[in-house]
Swiss-Prot record:
EC number, as in UniProt: 3.1.1.29
Site (Stabilizes the basic form of H active site to accept a proton): D84
Species the sequence originates in: Sulfurimonas denitrificans (strain ATCC 33889 / DSM 1251) (Thiomicrospira denitrificans (strain ATCC 33889 / DSM 1251))
GO biological process, one term: rescue of stalled ribosome
Enzyme kind, highest EC tier: hydrolase
HAMAP family tied to this protein: Pept_tRNA_hydro_bact
Subunit: Monomer.
UniProt function note: Hydrolyzes ribosome-free peptidyl-tRNAs (with 1 or more amino acids incorporated), which drop off the ribosome during protein synthesis, or as a result of ribosome stalling.
Residues the entry annotates as binding tRNA: Y13, F59, N61, N105
Active site positions, chain numbering: H18 (proton acceptor)
Protein name, as recorded: Peptidyl-tRNA hydrolase
SUPFAM superfamilies, per database record: Peptidyl-tRNA hydrolase-like (SSF53178)
Gene name for this UniProt entry: pth
Length: 184
């Protein structure tokens, strides 16, 4: 399985909403003691067991090419993409296979390069008050209230990803789909 976290490279974007996929990959690398195996493929690639973790180092809009290259080189069938989702309130976690990109340029690029048939782990980041503020919103840091729960949300998402390694999407979705983190 190839598990991809979407985000933008560089320190300026490290803790922004758009980089929540990168944050999950960073945590999975630690939890799984994954080994860095390559900085090729326009990304940083890690491996644990028979699974791969990828952080594309292209900007978000071009991430599909890195995913395609790793998928083809290692002949990987199953791809999971972790991404921010404006249409879900902060702390909401949902799972989906296939479907549209919903205006998300990282998903659009992925769809163009590998098809739409991959698992999406949708992490809610909320949306800005005004539609015209989307770009600045996704590239901004989380609020203090959100930051207070962000690590817990990321850890919970990691548990869901780990469950996907040995369970069906339906089982994982029924157990780990949440609304408005933190759980009470």
């Amino acid at each position: 399985m190839l598990i991809v976290g979407l985000g933008n490279p560089g320190a300026n974007y490290e803790r922004t909403r758009h980089n929540i996929g990168f944050m999950v990959i960073d945590e999975l690398v630690k939890k799984q003691n994954a080994q860095k195996i390559s900085s090729s493929f326009d990304g940083t690639l890690f491996k644990f067991s028979n699974h791969f973790l990828l952080k594309p180092l292209t900007f978000m809009n071009l991430s599909g090419s890195a995913i395609r290259d790793v998928k083809q080189f290692y002949k990987i069938d199953e791809v999971v993409v972790i991404h921010d989702d404006l249409d879900l309130p902060f702390g909401t976690l949902r799972f989906k296979k296939g479907g549209g990109h919903g205006g998300h340029n990282g998903l659009r690029s992925t769809d163009e390069h590998i098809s739409k048939e991959y698992i999406r782990v949708r992490m809610g980041i909320g949306k800005p008050e005004h539609k015209g503020e989307v770009a600045s919103y996704v590239l901004s840091n989380f609020t203090k209230d959100e930051q207070a729960h962000l690590d817990e949300f990321i850890t919970f998402t990691c548990k869901a990803i780990e469950a996907l390694l040995t369970n069906t999407l339906e089982d994982v979705s029924s157990k780990y789909t949440i609304k408005n983190f933190p759980l009470k």
